[in-house]
């Protein structure tokens, strides 16, 4: 069976080929994204494997179906880039990797928090220039502060476990309550209360129509002055222009982002020799109290191994007629 694998980097290929030793699928790797222009390269493939920024729109799916593609395998947890209704109508099965390594994303989240709090990124640049001044590097003790965790799935819970060790007070919000939150000493509250009481707010929820621009100008207005916000989930959860305005007004004291709502044309590529055309992103990246990483929170050896393993296992189960627990259906 032939599989077209889009948006692959060297690290993807390494782990996928390693796991494929037990399946012997015929793999064809492409280092560019799936879109209306590149869909033709999936000809003669039964399966297309894609990542977070690939185009799974109705138009693309229609072209895939015409080529005979029967499975779209996402090697990520999110599936907002795939038109699930269209896939179902076209007879294309969609599978994903729901929990490849919650700890990987959680640990990166904490890394962003600590770097922003203790100004480590600024201190690093200073010491490289023999500037050992401590002016402007004052942080705060995490111990005793209040963190608001929005989204209490596996990643949110992994973040809570770490922050409990810091001695933080944990507030949580999620429409679907997880009993582990109380076991960790956390407390569920409504969003407005979480906004008002949290010194740090961290996002761990999916990109859905209901969550689009969850953090907007109205939400920022309800928060403490100087709040720290970290987003390692989906870029569309934050209204970026509203965040810039809140940074200028010092409502947001620090912002850590591993995702960006218009990241498709930026992330996963080397743009160092180009002029970034996204003015909003350029303004955001110019702020000294903003720390951006390029959607790397998942990037650990363990996560890459799990992603490859579950992705190929999903495909094998579907082609073998076995039950696959990771099928994604339209709501």
From Swiss-Prot:
It comes from the Bacteria. Keywords: NAD, Oxidoreductase. NAD(+) binds at residues 154-155, 232-234, 258, 295-298. GO terms for molecular function: D-lactate dehydrogenase activity; NAD binding. The active site is at residues 234, 263, 295. The keyword NAD applies. The keyword Oxidoreductase applies. It holds the Pfam family 2-Hacid_dh. InterPro entries: D-isomer_2_OHA_DH_cat_dom, D-isomer_DH_CS, D-isomer_DH_CS1, D-isomer_DH_NAD-bd, NAD(P)-bd_dom_sf. Its EC number is 1.1.1.-. Belongs to the D-isomer specific 2-hydroxyacid dehydrogenase family. This is 2-hydroxyacid dehydrogenase homolog. It comes from Haemophilus influenzae (strain ATCC 51907 / DSM 11121 / KW20 / Rd).
